[in-house]
UniProtKB/Swiss-Prot annotation:
Protein name, per record: Transmembrane channel-like protein 5
Function description: Probable component of an ion channel. Molecular function hasn't been characterized yet.
Extracellular side: 1-420, 471-487, 603-616, 682-694, 771-796, 883-967
Gene from which the chain derives: Tmc5
Listed InterPro entries: TMC, TMC_dom
Amino acid sequence: MSSFHQNSSYMEDADYPGYSGSRNHTHNYLETQDYPEFPGSQNNPGFHHPRSNPHSSGSRTNPDYPYFQEEPDYPGSLSNTVYQDTRSHPFSAHSRTRPDYESSIEPDYNDFRSESYHAGLPMEPDYPGSQSHPGFAGVGRSSMNYTGPRTNLGYLGSLEEPDYPGAQDNSYYHSGSRPHSNLPGSRRDAGYAGSRINSYPDDLGEPDYPGAENQPNSPRFYGKPDYPGAEEGDGYSSSKSLAVIRRGNGPFGMLGRRNEDYPEGIGMVSMEMAGDPRNGYVNPAYTRRISPVCPDRNLLLCAHDWHTSVQGQKLIASLIPMTTRDRIKTIRNQPRTMQEKRELRKIVDKEKNKQSHGILEANCCAQCLGSLSLTYRRTRNGLSELLNYITLWQKRFKVIGGKFGTSVLSYFSFLRWLLKFNIFSFVMNFSFIIIPQFTVGAKNTLQFTGLEFFTGAGYFGDTVMYYGFYTNSTIRHRMGGASYNMQLAYIFTIGACLVVCFFSLLFSMAKYFRNNFINPHIYSRGIAKLIFCWDFTVTHEKAVKLKQKNLSTEIRENLSELRQENYRLTFNQQLTRFSAHVAAWLVSTGVTAACCVAVYYLAEYNSEFLKTHRNPGAVLLLPFVVSCINLAVPRFYSMFRLVERYEIPRQEVYVLLVRNIFLKISIVGILCYYWLNIVALSGEECWETLIGQDIYRLLLMDFVFSLADSLLGEFLRRLIGMKFTSLSLQEFDIARNVLELIYAQTLTWLGIFFCPLLPFIQMITLFIMFYVKNVSLMMNFQPPSKAWRASQMITFFIFLLFFPSFTGVLCTLAITIWRLKPSADCGPFRGLPSFIQSIYSWIDTLSRRPGYLWVVWIYQNLIGSVHFFFILTLIVLIITYLYWQITEGRKVMIRLLHEQIINEGKDKMFLIEKLTKLQDMEKRVNPSALDLERREVEPQIPLHLEELGAAPDLRLRRSAQEENPIA
């Protein structure tokens, strides 16, 4: 029956001697490989109508047979003349060729799939239970009002659209137009024998039960041999198995070839439900609605039975002898889902434990070490995920980066990086300096007026905020107990903070340099990340929009870099640009020099004025002027872009950064010169506290100006841009804002010796400035008009912070500690000739104790030796040069490898073109060979691909039958 629908004859029957699937064509069909010869078999010589008997009257090989090799001759066959109900008999009551035959070519059961009814065709079976049997329930199909045909507009499943659950055009589940799911004849009626829920794709080859994907172990489809021993039979483990008798429970019984008592009842298509447990075959779609199916039988591992397949067992066997690291790496590289990888790892571990059960004691230490290593990795990964989750401002960073790009985001990243420095410095100072001082500090008797917040003097002068409040005595709480030397604690704590900052800056520069300068994205530009980086776990609408903005911004940055590489200037344009750059540098340098001179003379004048006038507000004059200069001059520098016209935004930012840092560091350098040569030598009572108060006022005034500029200045600029459309909205000035951070951090490091609480003040200002800048950015600024990647900006920011800011601070503090004399009446170093003298005294004390002579040797030969520092500096320079050469070599190697990849791609394209030309030439010379090769390839098409084209093929076949019923 199955082959009939495909070929309109029984030529493809597995019983036929010329059948292509027969394994023994030369030894008669009786000797076909492993075919059972049960009683009643057509191949049984005792059977009275064996088709293999050439002298049988009904044999198809008998030349006298009227339908020689055309029609099957088993009882009930279409051409069997003795069969009463044969449809080929012109006078049979149920013959389709009879003039008064009611039924058409198409089956007339209620779940009939045809689009119209037609005249009868003598090639359709009409035995009882047949789809075309006239006694079938319902009116004949010759009636146009028949409720079953799909040409009836009232029929629920008309026009050949699948109406089973999950169908794409099933309106029953959406619009409710198919309310009767159990209507007799409906394909959704599971109890009906011809229902399409039947997994055996007898009805036009496509099962429609829920979740059906043509299970590989299900009974065979039409056109494929399904008897035991068939070559393509997946459902049978042996070719020598007995005949599979499928019992039926249809409403009309199982007559004809479906009857198990019938001689040819082998491998016939059953009308029974696939999920009926009595059959022994349980459809996975009913037991597991979403069972993964492996449509391709040649895959390495199938989703549901990968561990039982040969390939799966080989993979498991190859993973067992591997080390833990190699096994994890191999499993990670498998093209499987995470769930399948976990299951594979569990199976391998289980098998490995079984094999290693006998040598468990010998490998106990190795297993313990492996368990500890695994626990350590998991703990480290968990802590890393936790730190990433609780990282400060992580969500806000994503929003900023998505809307304004990495260039603007670099400012906020730098701000957060500076905040970490100040938190560390504050914790160190608070733990080792401030807390011990609280235990011995005297009560402050000065009155607090509120003006101290701006001036830093008055009430704050007699607190732990400034250097002059700290004691110079050794703290002891009881006689004979432990002592705490405040001089050593003060200088070692400040020194430790600066040393940690020094190495942190070095390592940070090295890390960012490695990530941003030695980067394969220089050549690939991260195109793969842009294409494959979408996170399908993101379902929230707001998060999806943010992700889209991030991707669009990165694409714009990539395109901008590509345009910049292809941009070239003529000689005249280059000469004009060079002249503009030189003029801008000359003007900016002159403005910086003028500002430095003005600040120096203002500081001297203000000092003389304060000696004669005790006005508390007069101390704010110098910080106010310096802050005005820092606010106005960088904006003046920003106007140079109209003349210089940089095509690459990164170059413009770098130039502005250098000009602004030169301005700010020059002003700070002039102030340091003023403090160390004027204030420190003026004979003031506590000059260290005065310097600390000046630095506090500068830092506070800079914060106030930045706050006012963000809340008022940028807001007014936005209103002006909205009023005058020619000006448009402003863009975030990265160079100016970053220089404000560098300037403030330089003052913090410079004043940490004179004002130990200055890191705490800077920490508060940075925290407030982040939120203020964030709000101002979202309200008052537009995204950069020229998108550009700022991956190297953080490295440049840290470099500017290290040099000249941090190195300048170290030089200033070194001069203070080694050259200047402390105040005689305040501070922990009072009465000493220099600050470093406290270290000398401590070393002399240790030299008289035999147990601490190693400390004395280290100080005298390493720390206090000029030769040691010279050798150390030379070693550092040599190592730096070597690493620089290694870096350059890696850059060259990366470039060569990139070129090699490009050349290999070109070679492959060349070979593909050559192969295509050769195939075209061979096709023109010998087209028959290609047709033969195509025929050999077509049977290898996967089953699920055949099913996709099955329904259209049947429709075309029915159309041909309609046009020529006799054919």
